[in-house]
C-alpha cells in the first residue's frame, strides 16, 4: 500500500512517514498543496493524508480538485482546524475522513487501515 502525506509541518510529516513505514506502508511526502495535488493526480496512491492549511493550495481545494478529476483515492484530512464547519467543509470537499490535531497515533493507524481496507470493495 502506498500513502501520500501532504503536510507542511516537516517534523510531523517525517514522523508520520516513519511510523507508516514501520507498518509496512510505502510513503511519499510533499510539503505544499500544489505538489500534493500533482502527486495525487498520478493515481499511484492507496490513500492521501492531507493537511488543510498548506502553502500554495489549501487542503480543501486539493480535495475538491481531486474529486473533480474523478480521482477516488481515499483522503484523510489531518488538521488543527476543529470547528464543526471546517469538518463539514472538508467532508463536503471530498475527504473520506477528518481528524483534528493533536491526534492519537493508534487511532490514526486504525483509520488508515479502515480506509485502505475499502480499496477494491464494491460499494
Q: Which residues fall in each region the model found?
A:
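N-terminal/domain-start alpha-helical segments
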Residues: 1-122
